[in-house]
Amino acid sequence: MEKVKLGIVGGSGIYEIDGVQDGNWISVDTPFGAPSDEIFTGSLNGIDVAFLPRHGRGHVHTPSNVPYRANICALKSIGVTEIVALSACGSLREDMKPGEFVIVDQFVDRTFQRSKTFFDQGCVAHVSVADPVCHRLGDMCRQVMDDLGLTYHHKGTYVTMEGPQFSTRAESILYKDVWNCDVIGMTNMPEAKLAREAEICYASIAMVTDFDCWHEDHDS
């Protein structure tokens, strides 16, 4: 099977990538079941890439039902060593406005219905996730943002809620004012933890789509 290096995990609304040469969709089986979709492989600007839509084409997987273990295992099995994960998020800060990006450097995991580790059923290991992202890959993402002239924030803490419902106003204020989180979403956990267990370099780019409900303009 063709070996690739850079994995791109697409979030809500991102089901394909442009500019890929010699692209084709491939099926990958894993011990954890099927991934969210087939994986699109090819070459982008001379780099071997593998693209996986996190929710599947047509957005068929809820955040709770995304097969996170199968996704990471499938990417690992075809040679991916680095993942750039894209996700839509809500802002918990006045200065992180809709249309801007955040290079996430920390997470708070509030999920409770998802399989979060590869190490169970007789295979036990304890992996540090104190620094859950790859700073080298994050720096490369920042350089690309600079080159493209995009408005972005160099770092931020992403709180992952279970979903599919959004947070209550009390929860939103808790995350913002007590826990000092910056953005909120539903999908980067346990994805980042699993990538660390699989020894894959992981970077997260959060795309701010709106203010969370702490903000008076959250519905606008």
List where the protein language model places each region.
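Non-catalytic positions within long, well-ordered alpha-helices that form the structural scaffold/packing
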Residues: 76-79, 176-177, 196
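Generic hydrophobic/aromatic pocket-lining and core-packing "Φ" positions
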Residues: 72, 172, 189-192
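Short acidic/polar active-site loop segments enriched in Thr and Asp
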Residues: 81-82, 182, 201
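Generic non-transmembrane alpha-helical segments
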Residues: 136, 140-151
